[in-house]
Each structure stands twice: as C-alpha cells, then as structure tokens.
C-alpha cells in the first residue's frame, strides 16, 4: 500500500512551511503531522495541567480536548481545539493558538520552556 501523507491540503501546506523553517521543534511537529489523522494525538487539558508549569508553551500536533481544567497560565499551540478547551484555556489566563499563527508569531523560543505533547 502506498503511503500518501495527509489528504488535507491546508495540513500539507502547513507541513511544507514547518519543514522550511529549519528549526528543530517545527521540523519535529511537521514529522508528527505527517502521520495519518487517525493516529494524531488527542490531548485533554488535565494532561497539559499535569505536565506543565506556569507560563510554559505546549505544542500539540493534533487536537486539544476540554476534559479537565487548567489551574495555571499556559500557551497551547495545536492543530485544532474543541470549543470547551479554548474557553477553559482562556479562563485560566492562557492562550490558545493554532500552529499556523504560532509559526508566524514565534520565530524562536529562546528562554521559554516548550513541551511537545504527543500522548
């Protein structure tokens, strides 16, 4: 069976842009997005809450779901968010940002604690 990659055109363009950035973090995210969508991670907020400290940046190469709550401020960068996840992230004082926007906003993460969460 031939491996074709993502069939979603916007995800394919995003993968290309991430690979062009030449930053190790964005290249790893591009590699994670290249897997089939059924194998992409779905991360709940309680997992993000467990594994982060205040003012951390979390990158999720999949979808963030709204189960659980955040008790500290976190910037979450993901391919997709559920509505409840966005509301809870903002209620805790954090920021929910798409990978598209983060690629333009964050040129480098010097001095910031960044975590790539897959499961």
From Swiss-Prot:
GO terms for biological process: translation. One of its GO terms (cellular component) is ribonucleoprotein complex. Keywords: Ribonucleoprotein, Ribosomal protein. InterPro entries: Ribosomal_eL18/eL18-A/B/_CS (IPR021132), Ribosomal_eL18_arc (IPR022947), Ribosomal_uL15/eL18 (IPR021131), Ribosomal_uL15/eL18_sf (IPR036227), Ribosomal_uL15_CS (IPR001196). Signal peptide: none annotated. The keyword Ribonucleoprotein applies. PROSITE patterns: RIBOSOMAL_L18E. The keyword Ribonucleoprotein applies. Transmembrane segments: none annotated. Pfam families: Ribosomal_L27A. GO terms for molecular function: structural constituent of ribosome. Belongs to the eukaryotic ribosomal protein eL18 family. This is Large ribosomal subunit protein eL18. The gene is rpl18e.
